[in-house]
Amino acid sequence: MSSSNVEVFIPVSQGNTNGFPATASNDLKAFTEGAVLSFHNICYRVKLKSGFLPCRKPVEKEILSNINGIMKPGLNAILGPTGGGKSSLLDVLAARKDPSGLSGDVLINGAPRPANFKCNSGYVVQDDVVMGTLTVRENLQFSAALRLATTMTNHEKNERINRVIQELGLDKVADSKVGTQFIRGVSGGERKRTSIGMELITDPSILFLDEPTTGLDSSTANAVLLLLKRMSKQGRTIIFSIHQPRYSIFKLFDSLTLLASGRLMFHGPAQEALGYFESAGYHCEAYNNPADFFLDIINGDSTAVALNREEDFKATEIIEPSKQDKPLIEKLAEIYVNSSFYKETKAELHQLSGGEKKKKITVFKEISYTTSFCHQLRWVSKRSFKNLLGNPQASIAQIIVTVVLGLVIGAIYFGLKNDSTGIQNRAGVLFFLTTNQCFSSVSAVELFVVEKKLFIHEYISGYYRVSSYFLGKLLSDLLPMRMLPSIIFTCIVYFMLGLKPKADAFFVMMFTLMMVAYSASSMALAIAAGQSVVSVATLLMTICFVFMMIFSGLLVNLTTIASWLSWLQYFSIPRYGFTALQHNEFLGQNFCPGLNATGNNPCNYATCTGEEYLVKQGIDLSPWGLWKNHVALACMIVIFLTIAYLKLLFLKKYS
């Protein structure tokens, strides 16, 4: 059995215009007829850990075992029960599986797959990953802008988009939003066709689909398969996994690959599968769906199958008596290995590979891009901004909440006085403003978590670099959503509270609140990047902010904390924001206007000036005492964003 990493590099001269290697004869007709994908001795194993945490031991599990086959232009279905390995095989063929634990060869027209195979082939995931706030046409435009060559004019790209829309029958809904849980959009079938259209933009010779009928009713599922059948007649090689198709869908299949427990039960023409199982002693009842019949055989849970096996027990026993004592899956696998279908497949595989072992070359999982970094950044930012405007619950609602909260706080603390109560109220409202900015930034955890599947799919497909996506999301989503509330909040609260009537103090407060929001949001991204569940990231963020509040400077005087604990204050975002706001507001204030500052003060214990209050809080009165807090927040922003980027960069993108 040959063993290699599945991806290899080949010279450009060996590929055609679609990025796939040509046949040995270099016949141009092969391009229009599609590509022939063959797989030789595919084995896939994963290492799992079993047992309790103290003594967990790694256990190797075999997902695919010695799988061979050929996928030609047409509809190639991979059928099997849940957990049988059909999705794993599809991912292996599409070069979307982690190479570790993988062995075997996958060839295109008898040559190794090109390094950019993932970008030149199409792959439609099971859960449709399209931007719901955009229209069908806008989603296709995004795919065309990032996956088609920059040498193509906008007119040529629009022609390609219109052709795909017409081919998929999306003319009537082309300018309708796809839809989200808050926005009513297109139907399930139209959404699935939009996902297919995103891949057809590159005009791939090979199209992979992971269970394309999932979540669709029988009529819609039938319509989707009829569409795929029509596409296959145009010369495309369409490979898809499917769980339990109805007969009207099954009869459309050109090739059938039947898997169970990672073993091959059958591989060959779909319409000859019934005859194959009949020769093995399994007879399908009249009016029974062949696909259901095959699954019944594998699972061994059909009464009809049991009766038929009982009728043919003698004949089967004569042919292979030893198989009666073996597990059903192993028995069916051996029957296939000894069949004429297997021998014909092996002979054709030998002919395709030229009878020679391919040179094994270890390569990294590199992804090629057709567009530049700046081009990708512009389109990712544009889409993110449209998504922001199309999500009222995330944009308009947040602004409304900010306005209402600002008015409420302004009413509670309205017209702060310059007396002892003014000191307490000022400190209280400044502390609230700081902590509110922190907890409002918890919503930033959704920025990468919600779009995780979309990001992974588009990144592997070569839409954009991680850096383009990361920076684009920051510029179009994070910056405006944290900057605008800070501006609104400052404009409302500052004048209602009657804070220091100086322009520079007003803008320093606004800038401080923005820096607190950015640093808290950056921390949220650092925690949430790579996470799959929003609730887990939100819980971690809340715990961190509650801990930081203790060291903010209001709940405890930081000068009184023991030295072995005082260093924790330097990790508190609210502490830097609260200190800067106090320095900005209290410096130069007089809270005992009726007393002569130069005379003897009968109330020596009272705090009469802002400077006295700041000194008691351990705050430096110099200008550096103000700006060092902003420098610290800026450093935290850089550190947290770097962590978030690295987590996205090294995120496990292959299953």
UniProtKB/Swiss-Prot annotation:
Changing residue 572 to R: Decreased protein abundance; loss of localization to the plasma membrane. Pfam families: ABC2_membrane, ABC2_membrane_7, ABC_tran. Residues 1-395, 450-477, 528-535, 652-655 are cytoplasmic. Its EC number is 7.6.2.2. It catalyses: ATP + H2O + xenobioticSide 1 = ADP + phosphate + xenobioticSide 2; urate(in) + ATP + H2O = urate(out) + ADP + phosphate + H(+); indoxyl sulfate(in) + ATP + H2O = indoxyl sulfate(out) + ADP + phosphate + H(+); sphing-4-enine 1-phosphate(in) + ATP + H2O = sphing-4-enine 1-phosphate(out) + ADP + phosphate + H(+). It is a multi-pass membrane protein. Changing residue 620 to N: No effect on protein abundance; no effect on substrate transmembrane transport. CDD domains: ABCG_EPDR. Highly expressed in placenta. Low expression in small intestine, liver and colon. Expressed in brain (at protein level). Residues 417-428, 499-506, 557-630 are extracellular. Changing residue 86 to M: Decreased protein abundance. Decreased localization to the plasma membrane and retained intracellularly. Loss of ATPase-coupled transmembrane transporter activity. Changing residue 549 to A: No effect on stability. No effect on estrone-3 sulfate ATPase-coupled transmembrane transporter activity. No effect on substrate-induced ATP hydrolysis. No effect on substrate transport. The keyword Cell membrane applies. The modification Phosphothreonine is found at residue 362. GO terms for cellular component: apical plasma membrane; brush border membrane; external side of apical plasma membrane; membrane raft; mitochondrial membrane; nucleoplasm; plasma membrane. Changing residue 435 to A: No effect on stability. Increased estrone-3 sulfate ATPase-coupled transmembrane transporter activity. Increased substrate-induced ATP hydrolysis. Increased substrate transport. Changing residue 141 to K: Associated with high serum levels of uric acid and increased risk of gout; results in lower urate transport rates compared to wild-type; decreased protein abundance. GO terms for biological process: biotin transport; cellular detoxification; export across plasma membrane; organic anion transport; renal urate salt excretion; riboflavin transport; sphingolipid biosynthetic process; transepithelial transport. Its main location: membrane. The record marks 418, 557 as: Not glycosylated. Disulfide bonds join 592-608. Specifically inhibited by the fungal toxin fumitremorgin C and Ko143. Changing residue 373 to C: Decreased protein abundance; decreased localization to the plasma membrane; no effect on ATPase-coupled transmembrane transporter activity. Broad substrate specificity ATP-dependent transporter of the ATP-binding cassette (ABC) family that actively extrudes a wide variety of physiological compounds, dietary toxins and xenobiotics from cells. Involved in porphyrin homeostasis, mediating the export of protoporphyrin IX (PPIX) from both mitochondria to cytosol and cytosol to extracellular space, it also functions in the cellular export of heme. Also mediates the efflux of sphingosine-1-P from cells. Acts as a urate exporter functioning in both renal and extrarenal urate excretion. This is Broad substrate specificity ATP-binding cassette transporter ABCG2. It comes from Homo sapiens. The gene is ABCG2.
